[in-house]
C-alpha cells in the first residue's frame, strides 16, 4: 500500500494506541447537519443517533417473519462488500440485509482482486467508485482503513465499517445493544461484564463506547492482565482480574474469544489452562444475576472461553444476536443511504 494512502497499522507495543489514532479527530461520519452519512465508529456518535438506529431496527425485525422478506428502500442502489479479512457472520448478514433492502450486492473476491497484485487501497476504491457504487461495506486488518476510504471516496458514496484492525466493529456493537435492549429494556439499571481478550478485541471497544453512551452505570472488563488494555478505568470501566469476582450479580455477560491471529507473542498458557481460569461454566454463570443473559460475537471456541452447557443453555441469546444483526444492519444501511452533505 502506498504510504500516502496507508491506514494506521495495529501494534501490540501500546495498549492505548487507539487513543492516538489521527482518524479519531473530528467526526467524519456525520454530515454538516449532524446526520449519519458513514458508520465508522460508535465512539463520538450522539446518543440520539444510536437510539435512532435501534428504533429503526425494530421496524425491520418483522421483515424476517414475512413471506416476502424484502422492502424497496435501496432498490437501484449498488452495495459493494469489501472484506479484506475473512468473515462468515458479518459478511453474510450484511449481504442478507442489503438484499432484503432490494439493493444490488457485489462481493469483491479480494484474493483475485488487483489489491493482491499491488494496487493501493485507494486506487481500488476509485475504480469501484467509477463503477457507480453507492455503498462500501469494509472489513480491513488495518485500523483506520474505513476512515481513509470515507475521506477519499466520491461524495455520494457511503462507507460502513465492518471491522478495522483492533479499532472498532460498530455494527456488532449496535446489534449487541439491540439484543440487550430487547431482553433488559432499561440500560440505566444494568451491570454488564465483558470477559476475555479485550486487548485485541474491536468488539469490546465498540461495546464499551455504546454501553457508556446509552447510560449503563457499571461496565466491567474481566480478563488476564496480559489481555486487558490500559485506559479502561479512564473510560469508567471497572477492571477485574478474577472471573468469579467480576461476574457477581451482573445482568449481561459478553464473552470474547482469544484473538490468536492478533497476538504477537505467547501471552497465555494452553487453551485448557485458559478455560480453567476464564471459561464461562454453569457454576460461574450462577454467580451472575438470576436472569442474566449470555452473549458472544462469534466465532465461539467451546471449551476455551465458554462451556457448551452455557452456550446452548436457556440464558444464552447468542443465536438471537445473529438474527437481530440482520435488522440492525438493515437499519444502518437504510439510514446512511438517505443522508448526504
Swiss-Prot record:
Coiled-coil stretches: none
GO molecular function terms listed in the Swiss-Prot or TrEMBL record: amino acid binding; aspartate carbamoyltransferase activity
Catalysed conversion reaction: carbamoyl phosphate + L-aspartate = N-carbamoyl-L-aspartate + phosphate + H(+)
GO terms, biological process: 'de novo' pyrimidine nucleobase biosynthetic process; 'de novo' UMP biosynthetic process; amino acid metabolic process
Residues bound to carbamoyl phosphate: 89-90, 139, 169, 172, 298-299
Positions annotated to bind L-aspartate: 117, 202, 257
Pathway connected to this protein: Pyrimidine metabolism; UMP biosynthesis via de novo pathway; (S)-dihydroorotate from bicarbonate: step 2/3
Cited PROSITE patterns: CARBAMOYLTRANSFERASE
Listed GO CC annotations: cytosol
InterPro entries, per the entry: Asp/Orn_carbamoyltranf_P-bd, Asp/Orn_carbamoylTrfase, Asp/Orn_carbamoylTrfase_sf, Asp_carbamoyltransf, Asp_carbamoyltransf_Asp/Orn-bd
Superkingdom of this protein's organism: Bacteria
Alphabetized UniProt keyword annotations: Pyrimidine biosynthesis, Transferase
EC number: 2.1.3.2
Family per similarity comment: Belongs to the aspartate/ornithine carbamoyltransferase superfamily. ATCase family.
Protein role: Catalyzes the condensation of carbamoyl phosphate and aspartate to form carbamoyl aspartate and inorganic phosphate, the committed step in the de novo pyrimidine nucleotide biosynthesis pathway.
Subunit field text: Heterododecamer (2C3:3R2) of six catalytic PyrB chains organized as two trimers (C3), and six regulatory PyrI chains organized as three dimers (R2).
Protein's UniProt name: Aspartate carbamoyltransferase catalytic subunit
Provenance organism: Paraburkholderia xenovorans (strain LB400)
Amino acid at each position: 500500500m502506498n504510504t500516502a494512502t496507508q491506514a494506521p497499522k495495529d501494534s501490540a507495543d501500546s495498549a492505548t494506541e487507539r487513543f492516538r489514532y489521527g482518524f479519531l479527530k473530528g467526526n467524519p461520519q456525520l454530515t454538516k447537519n449532524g446526520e449519519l452519512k458513514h458508520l465508522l465508529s460508535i465512539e463520538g456518535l450522539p446518543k440520539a443517533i444510536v437510539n435512532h438506529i435501534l428504533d429503526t431496527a425494530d421496524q425491520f425485525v418483522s421483515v424476517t417473519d414475512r413471506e416476502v422478506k424484502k422492502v424497496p428502500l435501496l432498490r437501484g442502489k449498488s452495495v459493494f462488500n469489501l472484506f479484506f479479512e475473512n468473515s462468515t457472520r458479518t459478511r453474510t448478514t450484511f449481504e442478507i440485509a442489503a438484499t432484503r433492502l432490494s439493493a444490488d450486492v457485489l462481493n469483491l473476491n479480494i484474493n483475485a482482486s488487483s489489491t493482491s497484485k499491488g494496487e493501493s487501497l485507494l486506487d481500488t476504491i476509485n475504480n469501484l467508485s467509477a463503477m457507480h457504487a453507492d455503498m462500501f461495506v469494509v472489513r480491513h486488518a488495518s485500523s483506520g482503513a474505513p476512515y481513509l476510504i470515507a475521506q477519499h471516496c466520491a461524495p455520494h458514496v457511503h462507507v460502513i465499517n465492518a471491522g478495522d484492525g483492533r479499532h472498532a466493529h460498530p455494527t456488532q456493537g449496535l446489534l449487541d445493544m439491540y439484543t440487550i435492549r430487547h431482553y433488559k429494556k432499561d440500560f440505566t439499571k444494568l451491570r454488564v461484564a465483558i470477559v476475555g481478550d479485550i486487548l485485541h478485541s474491536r468488539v469490546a471497544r465498540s461495546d464499551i463506547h455504546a454501553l457508556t453512551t446509552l447510560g449503563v452505570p457499571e461496565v466491567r472488563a474481566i480478563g488476564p492482565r496480559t489481555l486487558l488494555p490500559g485506559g479502561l478505568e479512564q473510560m469508567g470501566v471497572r477492571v477485574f482480574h478474577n472471573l468469579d469476582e467480576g461476574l457477581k450479580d451482573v445482568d449481561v455477560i459478553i464473552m470474547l474469544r482469544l484473538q490468536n491471529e492478533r497476538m504477537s507473542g505467547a501471552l497465555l498458557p494452553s487453551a485448557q489452562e485458559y478455560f480453567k481460569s476464564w471459561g464461562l461454566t454453569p457454576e460461574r454463570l450462577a454467580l451472575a444475576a438470576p436472569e442474566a443473559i449470555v452473549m458472544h460475537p462469534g466465532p465461539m471456541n467451546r471449551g476455551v472461553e465458554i462451556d457448551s452447557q452455557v452456550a446452548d443453555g436457556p440464558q444464552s441469546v447468542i443465536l438471537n444476536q445473529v438474527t437481530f444483526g440482520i435488522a440492525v444492519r438493515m437499519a444502518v444501511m437504510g439510514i446512511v443511504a438517505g443522508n448526504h452533505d
